[in-house]
Amino acid sequence: TEAEIAALKQYTDNGGKVILCSKSDRDNKYDNCAENSNALLTAIGAHSRIVNGIIVDNDLKANEAYRLYLSSKENFNTGHPFTAGAYTSSNAFGTTPATDNQTGFQLYNGGPVEVLDESKVQVLVRGYQSTWGTHYDGYFDGSSFVPEYDESVDGRVTVKKGDVNVMTYEDLPGGGWVITSGVTFFSNYDIKSDQDYANRFILRNILNSLKPAGTVTKIADVHKAAEKEEFTVEGTVTANASGYDKNT
């Protein structure tokens, strides 16, 4: 509602941080997810938008054109703190992208993310060179659909091959930030501890960034304290770090 958007704008104007997750136009019968998402993104001064369409890939899909596992290093912005280590820590590390390779960043029923200003927005997760955007409604029903890439058909291609963004990050005018994702990347199925999808490591990086910084205690004071007390220290470890032998 307009009141909810106004409340979120006030929140971000005061430095609030937002994760916006949207979806594709699949089953968009009663509401337009892209339209609703973009109304909020516009209000808070963001430079990313959700494309009204669906992310597909005929070459590297799983059992459906819109179920993808992004398992290549090139899919991740390894230089950003939110995605740093997500690829190497995930079950995709050391594998080769293939239709039967269900590793990496799990994406199902996602909408593409458009970047309006590349100088202000960083792409965190992107598709393959064979990934593109189309419309669900009116083209197919279920997993039987094999979308035909044809730019000459009006409205068939919403995002060209190789240009699909899945998740972006940008700083907001109020001092906070917004992550714009075309998919809810942290559902229970995406962050299961026994699967090691990249989704879980990205979420962990984000949550760790939100934790308050601990009070740093001088190492000399820690030496004087009783055992089993917890402290935050800064220093350089050279050897025997695990032995806790003060005499070495």
Label every PLM stretch briefly.
Residues S24-E151, G155-R156:
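An acidic, glycine-rich "communication" segment
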Residues P112-L116, Y169-L172, V237:
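Extracellular and analogous surface-interaction loops
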Residues A213-T248:
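OB-fold nucleic-acid-binding modules
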Residues T1-T42, G175, S181:
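Short alpha-beta junction capping motif
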Residues Q10-N14, L40-H47, N205-A213:
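Structured segments of extracytoplasmic/periplasmic soluble domains
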Residues T131-G214:
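Extracellular ligand-binding/catalytic regions of CAZymes and related secreted enzymes
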